[in-house]
Amino acid sequence: MSAKRVFEKFDKNKDGKLSLDEFREVALAFSPYFTQEDIVKFFEEIDVDGNGELNADEFTSCIEKMLKEVFVFCDVDGDGKIPASESYVTMTSLGKKFTEETSAEKVRAADVDGDGYLNFDEFMALVIGDI
């Protein structure tokens, strides 16, 4: 699932914009650890035009930025890859309720090139695909 598909899924009234309430659902789907304050602050930061709603472009850039920050944090050695063996820790730190076995299965499916690592695109597909 792409960031645009996530946008469409959570745009409940199909008006082409996400309200703060709709965005809250997205944020909590990514991680239940976000506080209300975190969500409001993040929403305000990515609402580039300041109209109190997120359009698809604002949302997509937000998701990519957020996931890039998580990816960089998890990419301890900075080589642009996260070992598949560490995905369980990464996913549970995002609040996902995976067993190690489930995590391994999801990583195998996301590891398109089969190298045993998740690059950013594979990581993004894994995280977004679980929403």
Curated annotation (Swiss-Prot):
Pfam families: EF-hand_7
CDD domains named in the record: EFh
Keywords of the record: Calcium, Metal-binding, Repeat
List of residues binding Ca(2+) 2: 47, 49, 51, 53, 58
Superkingdom: Eukaryota
Disulfide bonds: none
Binding site for Ca(2+) 3: 111, 113, 115, 117, 122
SMART domains, alphabetized: EFh
EF-hand domain ranges (all copies): 1-33, 34-69, 70-97, 98-131
Molecular-function annotations in GO: calcium ion binding
Database matches in SUPFAM superfamilies: EF-hand
Residues that, per the record, bind Ca(2+) 1: 11, 13, 15, 17, 22
KW Hydrolase (keyword) present: no
General function of this protein: Potential calcium sensor.
Protein name in UniProt: Probable calcium-binding protein CML34
Organism: Arabidopsis thaliana
